[in-house]
């Protein structure tokens, strides 16, 4: 055939068959410990539930998405106790912790009934708690779930 004819039916490049991933040889705890070695900023995400109660959790899965418009992204496990409030509520705050707030980060990383005891905050947009002493705080509207 001429130059404008159909392409040849012979493959010019070798075709490779993908190899299936093997199950990990490490435990979930070992994986968590290794990920914990990754230096990253730490945040506490806060909100007010429909019943007026406060929720908050330590999160390091925080990223900027866009400067214009200002958009951020963070992740939460579907099994998290605060998921119902954060997935249905309209507002929340992301509080970027300062270097001297390690104890606060640890407090909000664990399940505790007294998590909010003696924690200084102001009420932000939609009732979301804005933590005193945070290096920065973002008052957010839930755009995507």
Predicted regions: what they are:
Residues 2-145:
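Active-site-proximal mixed secondary-structure blocks
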